[in-house]
Amino acid sequence: LCNLFCTLRKKEMKKFIKYLIQLYTKIQNKLPSHPISHLPLSKVDIQPIIMIPGSSATENRFNKMVQKLNHGQHPHHSLIRIKVWNDSRMTYRGHLKLKDRNPIFVVGFQNNRDGYKNIKKQAAMFNAAMTVLREKYSFTSFKGLGHSNGGLVYTVFLQQYLANHSGLEMEKLLTIGSPYNLNKKEVSDRVPMLEDFVTNQDKLPQQLQHLSILGIFFRDGDGIVHRSSVEAGSLIYKGKIASHREVVITGKAAHHSSLPQNEQVVDLIREFLLG
């Protein structure tokens, strides 16, 4: 009887803690945003993890994933969510712990539409955000994560903008369900974006380590992106950087929109970017 009572109490406590986390997140999302110039200072040298969400998603896209990443981690990683507006303004929400060496910055865009033309615009907006972050924190190295089209934005940034940031090195990039050949099902049917990525592959940083996560939810893809489109990333990265690896995630939680919160994916993120 005691064991049953204790088990029930534990379940109730877990539900209550989950409720508190959800409530805290809702409150955080409703807090007013601040101009990017008001970003708090750090008391330590940082190597941030900078994340880019996919099309139609906002800077809040990774809230649940970061909660899972922080579970059991001491201390927790700070989460700063930055939004780049079409008029070049930048605002942020979140709190930076003064001694957090690996804070998480998420950069979202007002223009979060799909299509190669918009992806190039988003890469320019991301570059502007990187300039502001470097001016504020003077970091020389960072790691990145891109979900879906966020991985494409990162690819454009690496090939077109990174070299302009003197003394900056990108150590690792983790992409999740990134469609390097957009909606095509055959690698032989290359879209102009993939052609550009392959043409400019020599501009990729040679020291970069890349982990590409592919979801198999239904037949040959994650329900949104075809397997071959994600695998086309090897045409861009393999042999041009320090390492390129692909990991396949299967099952009910391998749908395109579920992948960032997938427990296996969270473990891979923790191992690859936080390890």
Language-model features, listed with the residues they occupy:
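Polybasic, lysine-rich low-complexity intrinsically disordered segments
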Residues: K10-K11
